[in-house]
Amino acid sequence: MSEIIQDLSLEDVLGDRFGRYSKYIIQERALPDVRDGLKPVQRRILYAMYSSGNTHDKNFRKSAKTVGDVIGQYHPHGDFSVYEAMVRLSQDWKLRHVLIEMHGNNGSIDNDPPAAMRYTEAKLSLLAEELLRDINKETVSFIPNYDDTTLEPMVLPSRFPNLLVNGSTGISAGYATDIPPHNLAEVIQATLKYIDNPDITVNQLMKYIKGPDFPTGGIIQGIDGIKKAYESGKGRIIVRSKVEEETLRNGRKQLIITEIPYEVNKSSLVKRIDELRADKKVDGIVEVRDETDRTGLRIAIELKKDVNSESIKNYLYKNSDLQISYNFNMVAISDGRPKLMGIRQIIDSYLNHQIEVVANRTKFELDNAEKRMHIVEGLIKALSILDKVIELIRSSKNKRDAKENLIEVFEFTEEQAEAIVMLQLYRLTNTDIVALEGEHKELEALIKQLRHILDNHDALLNVIKEELNEIKKKFKSERLSLIEAEIEEIKIDKEVMVPSEEVILSMTRHGYIKRTSIRSFNASGVEDIGLKDGDSLLKHQEVNTQDTVLVFTNKGRYLFIPVHKLADIRWKELGQHVSQIVPIEEDEVVINVFNEKDFNTDAFYVFATQNGMIKKSTVPLFKTTRFNKPLIATKVKENDDLISVMRFEKDQLITVITNKGMSLTYNTSELSDTGLRAAGVKSINLKAEDFVVMTEGVSENDTILMATQRGSLKRISFKILQVAKRAQRGITLLKELKKNPHRIVAAHVVTGEHSQYTLYSKSNEEHGLINDIHKSEQYTNGSFIVDTDDFGEVIDMYIS
């Protein structure tokens, strides 16, 4: 035997072979045919069961026998894949109308595996036989099987639109399909309307076919998504569980789930809800129970007393498979190719298939009727000359000779002669003659009717309509899925997601933040907070886990951090740097932090920069749903820094102090509300080379403490300040020296809450009591606290 060796590039061989493989799995494995809604393996299973007489009116047979028939004659693949497909056709939570009835364990909605095929038994369902009806009447084309030992159908007659009724799902090379199941009566009604009016619009069709009808029921939201899918083949809907509320004897409420979204694993859903409860992601759930039994699906979610059941339900819709989105992708094989099809195209393809099936069946029946008519006419003729026929047969040598004599003497045809010689003697009665004459009349009427169907397209369509109506009447069922026009917006109260707990929030000047339990805080003391060397406490306060923290930086940005998302860390331990929660720039510094309980308030923030700009923005502007990156609080120009952020419930006085000792006090009412991206207006008229070191709210009982670079502290009372208008130069608070003048490096408004100060140089720090600093007059430079020769030049001061 000679060998032919071809020299081919690997690229060409791979491309060619993968192309063949892709075509095979697209056409022969993963995608359904638009005409019968079946994938090849499903079609082969149903045909194998039908061929072997495993029909609904017979006893159940072992599934292993069917699997053996399928892989032995039609589907040369693994037995597991065939059995898996067979089981799916029997699962009433997967198919709207099952095509196989199965005895034994055929899996569950919990995704439990079915029993082995040697244990289960199956037979065709009554509806499945409507897919195969008339297959023996040459209605569809047959092709040789994989080893040319028998024939198999290319498609089933499919007397109802199975693709829409039972839907399909599958993935192949470059294609995927997701076609939802629908209500059989609605689909047939829509098909009937399409037959009457091929120009019917999708809107008109949707009067009859409302939308998907999932075997698991549920609530479908989004008419627009359904319409889009029916028009283009692609669309999105929301499918949510059916949830009812019950009240228990102890006064508690519980949510009862009786229907879940299509193809959601029930046990996984129960597990997920219980995990949300155990992980305290949702507050208010006592227990989750799966109470499903023979009477139907039932999941009970027992709630705590006085919780908002609607909010818990909404939280579960959003954070579990209690609600899912279903994406239509209606791809099917049409004319040998995968196509994305709208509902009109699917119905049209099905209708064309039915026209062909009914026409082929009519031709087959007409041919048989004409053949029978021919035989009946021969028998009637023979009975009219019965004595001569009998005499001729008796004088013949054998059967063959008798047939030839009948053809030659009486001009019977071959078929008629065969029927005559096979006629039994008891048939030669008057009763039989009358019966033959009656049959002749019936055949005449039948032939006339069949020819009319073939010659008249409307008559053929009427046959299709009549048969569809019969199936509709016989198999119709109530819709299981409720359809709602709009997709409901899910609103979740924060109280449901986060248990309410009072905690201590702390922020250090170097940006370390944490929340600490009241118990841990009380067991220690403010001074015992965990700090890095050189760091100090910027702020600490009692907050609730349902509050939100706004962290402001020198870049004019803010971080929006829900308190419950902060790490729960003991008071004596180091907190978490804000950059680990929300990424910030390397040179970005935290300048203040505030706690918000409710953003629906008249309160406002005031922002002040080093170069003397100021602005006011209302608190509601800062509410956001984005937690993962810094947001703009105010526009900070180049070579400027935000140095102060204040929060006020109402307008009040603020004091601005500059490096060169100027001070201006005015009311925030002079500031207009502005957006977050605004830069603001001029706060103070700065001298050359001067800059702002402090902008803070001030009241009549407050004092102001200032620190100079030379180690001096000066404390003044409110009465020295002169209330003026914004953008003026202000008053002088220092005595100007010609040599080494004092410059204010830090200043703070001192209220009754403050008792200590801390001075910082690059390498040292000095602590003292604020009350030890006597109040000074306006034109003084205060009192020296540290010797800069030993301590170093003062660079900052904090008060606490």
UniProtKB/Swiss-Prot annotation:
Reaction(s) this enzyme catalyzes, per UniProt: ATP-dependent breakage, passage and rejoining of double-stranded DNA
Name of this protein: DNA topoisomerase 4 subunit A
Source organism of this protein record: Staphylococcus aureus (strain Mu50 / ATCC 700699)
One annotated Gene Ontology cellular component of this protein: chromosome
Topology in the lipid bilayer: Peripheral membrane protein
Top-level class of the enzyme under EC nomenclature: isomerase
Family statement: Belongs to the type II topoisomerase GyrA/ParC subunit family. ParC type 2 subfamily.
Catalytic residues as annotated in Swiss-Prot or TrEMBL: 119
Function comment: Topoisomerase IV is essential for chromosome segregation. It relaxes supercoiled DNA. Performs the decatenation events required during the replication of a circular DNA molecule.
Cell compartments where the protein resides: Cell membrane
Subunit structure: Heterotetramer composed of ParC and ParE.
Lineage: Bacteria, Bacillati, Bacillota, Bacilli, Bacillales
Site (Transition state stabilizer): 118
Keyword DNA-binding found: yes
Source taxon at top rank: Bacteria
Domain Topo IIA-type catalytic: 31-495
